[in-house]
Amino acid sequence: MPATLSHEVSGPRSDDTPVLVLLGSLGSDRSMWDAQARDLSRDHTVVAVDHRGHGTSEVVPGPCTIADLAADVLALLDSIDVDRFHVAGLSLGGAVAQWLAVHEPTRVLSTALLCTAAKFGEPSGWADRATAVREGGTAAVADAVVARWITAARAEAEPELVAGLREMVLGTPAEGYASCCDALAGWDNRAELGRISCPTLVLAGDEDPSTPPEALREIADGVPGADFVVVSPAAHVPTVEIPDRITDALRRHLDAARNTGAA
């Protein structure tokens, strides 16, 4: 049974307006896309989504898979009468976006994969993190997580930004966070990359310690015709760190996708 997802729909709704779905990182809520949603909703129907167990979405106890998270998104889109859509996903959201592009090619018009991976390290690391959070809450990992989200220079210059991001992680229910760690532990899409047939943008942050540029290069090399971009200076969540540049990159990608016939 899919989880009920909190979400926000912005922008015009019409048969001619393209739909853009935004999927965020582990430990985030949909506000990590606020800057992009404000701009892109001028000419897209933007659906910004909180994964299960994130933001105010339903918490489903126990482990889940990336396929489960994708099923949640599809159920949400069905409930609001969205058939075909563009999708942008960052980190965990990028894994979900990959799954959607592989398994729902008739629905996914294009995909933007930001600071993500076809495989996120070894399962044991995610199992350890899930255990730490189930035992100590997201406070057990919040500082380490936020240190990876933005560059050290930006963190030093804007302590209020660090504080806000830390509150975002702390606001994530422990079971929701841990369950999505379980999903990442089981994720390995490397053999499926060649099945992604829609226009694809692959974007890396030059200082991202979680999914460094080589992880994104692996995706770009595996997806036929993918565009590969490295942005600088940026760590793991460039939607917040350099929002205007990410918005511009997404707009160029969406415009190019439309020009190839992806409505």
Language-model features, listed with the residues they occupy:
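Short beta-strand/loop motif that positions the catalytic acidic residue
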Residues: 196, 202-204
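Catalytic active-site module of serine/aspartate enzymes centered on a nucleophile-bearing elbow/loop
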Residues: 226-263
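Conserved HGGG/HGGXW glycine-rich cap/lid loop of the alpha/beta-hydrolase fold
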Residues: 6-59
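Acidic catalytic loop of the alpha/beta-hydrolase fold
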Residues: 206-211
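Flexible "cap/lid" loop of the alpha/beta hydrolase fold
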Residues: 98-103, 107-142
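Conserved alpha/beta-hydrolase catalytic His-Asp/Glu region
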Residues: 121-124, 136-194
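Gly/Ala-rich beta-loop-alpha elbow adjacent to hydrolase catalytic centers
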Residues: 89, 93, 97
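Conserved acidic catalytic loop of the alpha/beta-hydrolase fold
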Residues: 68-85
